[in-house]
């Protein structure tokens, strides 16, 4: 199947005027599901960081990070409009569906990017703003425009963009980067390949049709399955590092170990999956559990922190 370059073509014939795009269409352009994970992990970084931040400033910080994440999503949809129109899971996005013009999405994304970075710098901290600006640049220019269509390691390197939010949240409070914030970064960074390669396995045909060189399409199912197990193990190890490094309790460590074993267990299910299995049930199960894993790990860190504050320092 040939992919048409829709950066100019998508939405041009019979395209709606700006006034015809609803607020919901623009909200969908922000990738709200992805944004929810970004906001949650950034919030975790902000809460777990030592020190105090004014609640209003903290809210402003999280809002700016959310807007920056949404801006990245809008710019990603602008650039990927051609392949989004072909893939079933993305064909209903606002640009390929003809609800928003590509140039509108570009202007929207650039405006929100600048707004989020400037406000975060002025209201909170310029290091945090710099990290947010770098994250937006890395996701849009490095991952979306370069890596995604050029190498099967796209998600490994590009996954760094999704791992920065807790580090940004941490920097909003402390004005710096620490070992703890790097560990939070690593948990997400190492989690990303197994999560997305599980998706790539059961969407292999669609990625192949649009020319995106995902690991299963370039290196085959067997290699992808082995790589998934390796990254699942690394993710499980990184998940217990907060306890090993002394900034989370043994209770958290026990829960993180159980979650990590579950993650590895699901990855082994993918490894045992027969070659050419069209149903890809183990891959779908791993993909679903990986989302649960990440939310559970960061939730456990927050609960562990709250218990420690109440036990040792009174009511938060």
Swiss-Prot record:
Pathway listed: Porphyrin-containing compound metabolism; heme O biosynthesis; heme O from protoheme: step 1/1
Compartments it resides in: Cell inner membrane
Primary location recorded for the protein, binned into one broad class: membrane
UniProt xrefs under CDD domains: PT_UbiA_Cox10
Coiled coil regions in record: none
Listed PROSITE patterns: UBIA (PS00943)
GO BP: heme O biosynthetic process
Positions of transmembrane segments: 34-54, 55-75, 95-115, 118-138, 155-175, 182-202, 228-248, 250-270, 287-307
Keyword Flavoprotein assigned: no
Any single Gene Ontology cellular-component annotation: plasma membrane
Pfam families per the UniProt record, alphabetical: UbiA
Entry's Gene Ontology molecular function annotations: protoheme IX farnesyltransferase activity
Catalysis performed (reactions): heme b + (2E,6E)-farnesyl diphosphate + H2O = Fe(II)-heme o + diphosphate
Note from the entry: Carbon 2 of the heme B porphyrin ring is defined according to the Fischer nomenclature.
NCBIfam families reported for this sequence: cyoE_ctaB, PRK04375.1-2
Name listed for the protein in its UniProt record: Protoheme IX farnesyltransferase
